[in-house]
Amino acid sequence: MKYLPFISRFDKLWLSRMGWHTKQRYIIFESDDWGAIRMSSKSSLDKIRNLGYQVNRNKYESNDCLESGEDLSRLLEVLIKFKDECGNNPIITANFVMSNPDFEKIRAQQFSNYYSEPFYRTYERYWSNNNVSTIIEQGINSTLFYPQFHAREHFNVFSWMKALRNNTYGMRTLFDLGCVGTHINELGGNDYVRAYNARTRNELDFIEKSIEDGLRLFYKIFGFQSKTAIAPNYLWNKCLNRTYRKEGVEMLQGSYRQIESEYSKHNKISHYLGERSNGIFYSVRNCIFEPCQMGGNKAVQRCLYDINNAFRLGRPAIICSHRVNYIGSINPKNAINGLDSLNILLEQIC
């Protein structure tokens, strides 16, 4: 296990001692990115590699894809095997991206305007035997899978559309393959996924409207309000808290660190569990379970360490585990690794 620098460890420990405590041993799974396109397909990935894009440097670009019915069924099959001492199954808080680009409409308008489609329409386009929405409903009814709000879209619309108009990095070739940007920067990250990275007041107004629209679409699709939300990549302007609250959000999921986007600069803001701002409570993730990134055994051991540390400090164990860990349409071995690791983790904690 790689240890953080001392100052970072100290800072994290200090924050973890602040705020809400409990003697109860709660374990919470939070999983981001459901409903969103990342890599469109295995064939698209192969073509992009052949074009020279360094997609292998990013585990998300080379493994993550829109979830299929098979992906969800296998995840639910693991969850339903386990119960706590009260007879409750583990439940995944699944943070949904509500829409994806409508590629045909955008192309028809020659990249002059952005158009989107709700994620269930994307399911219909992707999967011939489209049973994904049915399985999501089964997961909700079985208290195994509970949707919450992530974003309307998980990419920066302004940056992406500008890149399409200018064909930056051959973006239109990637667009034709059904991908939402796969330009990998020198750190191995995707430059387009920071959805709330506003550079101007106009962009911030657009983001505010996207949150309003996204939360209303969430209610229309699922039939209940999302009481929590999480900003993509933990990056948002704190003025957006008022928008979240106005639309019924009571708590923001997140990390110890918020990256606040203030146009041309980014500020780092510390948060602790139970902190309140503009009527919004903060929930802070203090455990990591990412077998796709870390490998199965390391991911299990790291998560168990984090859980024990959370309990030692009188905190619930709030586990971050992204969708990519359970997706097998592009790389079947990735899903096998993720689900096997989840099975081992649950055997240890249930």
Tell me the role of every PLM-derived stretch.
Residues 2-228, 233-282, 299-321, 329-350:
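Catalytic alpha-helical scaffold of carbohydrate-active enzymes acting on polysaccharides/glycoconjugates
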Residues 287-288, 292-294:
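A conserved mid-domain beta-alpha-beta active-site/ligand-binding segment of alpha/beta enzyme cores
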Residues 324:
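Short, glycine-/Ser/Thr-/acidic-enriched flexible segments
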